[in-house]
Amino acid sequence: EGRWEKVISQVKKGDYVFIQFGHNDEKTDSARHTDPGTTFDDNLRRFVNETRAKGGIPVLFNSIVRRNFVQPKDASIAKDARQTPGEQELPKEGSVLFDTHGAYLDSPRNVAKEMGVVFIDMNKITHDLVQGLGPVESKKLYMFVEPGKIPAFPKGREDNTHLNIYGAR
């Protein structure tokens, strides 16, 4: 997408560069997909190396939690139904957050350790926040828009991945 090139071109000595990827790397679209343990990790190493080459200070994060609440009995299902076309949706919203990131959460931690980079577990931080708020209150952090409230989303929007302005703060 060319976004990294814009960022790295502006990095100066002493700048902190916060590096967090994963949500789009999980997609099946070949233009975006990477695999944890191989191509995903290689990209993280590249970003760390390029940041250091410019005199910047890289900090690696794993992905924030998706707001996917399931019934307690479904909280440990082994696969993410979003990844298999044609499969049923996840069960009706429940009270327990379901991990959709799998091994993508480990890669930034592993690369940070390997390369001597600070790692911040944003998944744990946001998981605890969202789980603590619960299914109803946590919607206030994400892009849940009532129909007719915002011109860009005339029919409304229910987005469990992207934070709104309040959630991003």
What are these regions (language model features)?
Residues 3-169:
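Alpha-helical cap/lid subdomain in secreted, periplasmic
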